[in-house]
């Protein structure tokens, strides 16, 4: 009988990078449309969506959520597509979160 020595090594797991999805203010997109997008794509309750919309309006941008890269990229694509279908220039962007 042959014995085989096995060596196990512990790999350090890297914490996956996280990305914020932000919406940017513009002079054309209606506040109601922004609230609708926040409810539809970011699953925000009406009052939370309204608060985020006001932050976008006042500060020029606001974070809608923090996700893995794939999920964040999907949300950005969905919002861009939905905005274009509705002839709105609403612009979502990704920003990497530094942990």
Each model region followed by its residue ranges:
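Terminal domain-initiation and capping elements
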Residues: 1-99
